[in-house]
Regions:
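N-terminal helix-loop segment corresponding to the beta1-alpha1 unit
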Residues: 1-93
Length: 95
């Protein structure tokens, strides 16, 4: 008996669900990553400039934190200044 390998993964339990992640450092990004692993479309909002502090936190490899590489997978990121009206308006239109 042979096993068949699926070339196309099956959709996750959260396929079709959009999540807006606004957290920083560990807890928020971890939750967003986990939801993305279950198929959610995760959009991370970061402040313009430095972005999430996790990008530069410990264990820098090739200019990027290993923590960031792990916690940012399965996501799309957008830089918006939510302190400004324009950033707030864009977040409602595009997300």
């Amino acid at each position: 008996m042979t096993q068949q390998t699926r070339l196309v993964p099956t959709p996750g339990a959260l396929n079709g669900v959009r999540v807006v992640e606004m957290g920083q450092l560990i807890a928020g990004p971890f939750c967003g990553k986990t939801l993305g692993e279950f198929g959610a479309d995760v959009v991370k909002i970061e402040a313009p400039g430095a972005g999430d502090p996790l990008r530069n936190w410990r264990l820098i490899k090739n200019g990027t934190s290993v923590w960031w590489q792990v916690q940012s997978r399965n996501k799309r990121s957008v830089a918006l200044d939510l302190r400004q009206q324009e950033g707030q308006d864009l977040s409602l239109i595009h997300i």
